[in-house]
Amino acid sequence: RVLGMGEAMGKAGGPEVSAMQDAVRQSMEDGAFGIGSALIYPPGNFASTEELIAINSAAAPYGGVYITHMRSEADNFLEAIDEAIKIGTEAGVPVEIYHLKAGGQRNWHKAAEAVAKIDSARAAGVDIQANMYPYTAGGTGLTACFPPWASADGKLFDNLADADMRGRIRAEIENQTEAWENLCSLSTPEGVLLLGFNKAENRKYMGRYLADVAAEVGKDWIETAFDLVLDERQRIGTIYFMMSEENVAMQIGQPWMKFGTDAGGIDPETATGLSHPR
C-alpha cells in the first residue's frame, strides 16, 4: 500500500494496483510466503476490499497466504470476518486471522458467532484458520485511540499541534461518525495501561493507567493522550484490557486455533521498559 499510494487516503487506481501486484509477484519470487494486512491502522485501513483481493490474487499462483489483522476486532468484528473470507475466496488464497478476539465488553457475545462463521466457512471448503494470544489484553500504540485520518500523509504530530485539527480529532473521538476502532473507548481509560515512553520526564507514567495519569495532570483522557503523543512524537506502546477470560478459554479449544505472541523480542538483561506478558 505504501509503495503504491504512500500514506495517502483514497482509492488506489489501476496503475497503483498494478504496481502493488508487481511488487507482490517479485516478493513471492524472492521467497515471501504471502500478504499481511493491518486494517485498523493507517495506511493499511485505507485499502478497500477490492484492492486487497487484487493484490492477493497476485500471490495466489505462488501459493501465497493472506494473513490479516482484520478491519475490526470489536464493533464490526463479524463483518470483518466476512471480509476476510471474501478476500480469501475471491483471490484464491488461504486465510490466517491474526490474534482473533472480540474486543470491548459490548462485543464479547460475538466471539461464539465468530467461531461459528469460521467453522461454517471451513465446512464449505474455505481454508481459513486463526491465531490468538491466551491473555485478556492486546498491545499497540496509544495512537490507536485516534481516528486513522488524523495520521494521513504522515501528519499526525502536525495535526496534534494545530488547534483546529486537534478540535476535529477530539470531535470524532467523542462522537464517532466513521467506522474505526477506538481502543480507548473499548477498554475504557481505566483499562489503558501506558508503557512505552522515551523521554525521561515521562517515564513516571510507565505502568500506569491513562485514567490515573489524566487525573494527575488535571485534564480529560483525550487531552492527556494528545499531549503525551505530541510530546513523545511517537505512538507510545500501550496495553488495552478489553477481552474476557471466558472467550479466551473458548477460543483455545478450537482445533484450527494457533498461538502467537504478536510481540517483538526483548533482551531481559538490557530491557528498561515494561512489556506485554505474552
Question: Where does each model-flagged region fall?
Answer:
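Active-site neighborhoods of metal-dependent hydrolases
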Residues: 1-14, 20-41, 56, 86-89, ...
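Divalent metal-binding pocket/active-site signature
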Residues: 17, 26, 32-83
